[in-house]
Each structure stands twice: as C-alpha cells, then as structure tokens.
Amino acid sequence: MKGSLIIVVFFVLGIIVSLCDVIPSSFPASDVSYYALCCLMFCVGISIGCDTSILKSFRKVNPRLMMLPVMTILGTLAGCAAASLILGHRQLSDCLAIGSGFGYYSLSSIFITQYRGAELGTIALLANIFREILTLLCAPLLAKYFGKLAPISVGGATTMDTTLPIITRYSGESFIIVSIFHGFCVDFSVPFLVTFFCSL
C-alpha cells in the first residue's frame, strides 16, 4: 500500500511540475521514458537472476496449481474484452494492453505511454494501482467467499511481493509458494503481452 501511494505522489508531482512550466518545453520526455524503461527492465532481470531460491522453490508447486497464472491471464483479458464493449470510445487493444499490466503499474504504464501516449499510460497506471489496492483491502472477503486462490488470482503480478503478506495471512502459509510462482509467471508475461497489444 505504501509503495502504491509513493508512486501516486510522484505521479501527481510530475503533473504539477509540468503545469507550472518548471520543465522547459524542449525537455525530451519521451526519451527519458524510454531510458527509464530500459533501466527498469534491467533491474527486473537482476532481481530474478539474483534470487535463485525462487526458481528452486517452484519445484514444490502442485502441477495442477501451475495453471493458475494462465487462468489469471485469460480471465483478466476476458474481463478487459468485456469492458471494451461497454467503453465504446476505447479500442479492444487499448483495454487489453491496460489489463495486461496485471497490477505491475510501474512497468506497464511506461510501456503503454511509450507506445500509445500519456493518456492511456495514465489510465494504465491508475487501473493497475487500483488492482493492487483492491487485493490488499479485499483479500479477507475474497478468501472467505471465493476460495483461497481468489486473492492470488486477483493480485496478478503483485503476489510475489507487495500483496504476498496479506495473501499469506488470509489464504494460509501453504499458499506462499503458489503465490510466488503465480506472481513470477504473471510478472514475466507483462512486457510481452503489453507490447503485443500496443502493437495491434
């Protein structure tokens, strides 16, 4: 929750700074976004490569539960496709690109801003932050009424880090490895799916 609020604060500060004309109009904002994206992808690669224990722990995951990330991805994309029918002013590819962030707001919003512009990037940022906050706030209800796997699926890419403690609390410690595996797989899919739908 704290991390999400910090991101929102910096986002709002960026808007205020731009509106106050503090930054010159010649400032290469798109180039900065691109280099920030490259740095972020580099850091993601380092974090995965350094933590070999994550890869080793995946051997303990029940083979049937390995399908959970696939179901999360398909369910999210189906929901986004349905939303595009209601939001007539948005293309199907826009909605699918936003949904493909799966809660990974920092990466997906930069990608979408780079490919589709600041407006859609902002929507992606807020939509994915709301997904994380929804998981944090509703995990008890999700686990109670929809089963122990529900908070994991709703958490999307966040289940290996920010939402892991709350999932562990309400789904149980037996789901820790499943949650990490789920988050890793969904997290890994984000750059590929977002760029794919943005290119349509």
Regions found by a protein language model. Name each.
Residues S189-L200:
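Juxtamembrane boundary at the C-terminal end of a transmembrane helix
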Residues C38, T135-L136, T163, P191:
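Hydrophobic transmembrane alpha-helices of multi-pass small-molecule transporters
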Residues I46-S57, A83-S84, I110, A139-A143, ...:
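C-terminal ends of transmembrane helices
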Residues D21-V22, L87-H89, R116, G147, ...:
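Short helix-capping/hinge motifs at transmembrane helix termini and TM-loop junctions
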Residues M1-T76, L92-G103:
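Helical membrane-embedded segments and adjacent short helical loop/helix-boundary regions
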Residues S93-I133, K148-F181:
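Alpha-helical membrane segments and immediately flanking helix-loop junctions
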Residues M66-I112, F130-F146:
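Transmembrane alpha-helices that form the ion-translocation and gating core
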Residues T52-A81, G121-I133, V178-V186:
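Entry/N-cap segments of selected transmembrane alpha helices
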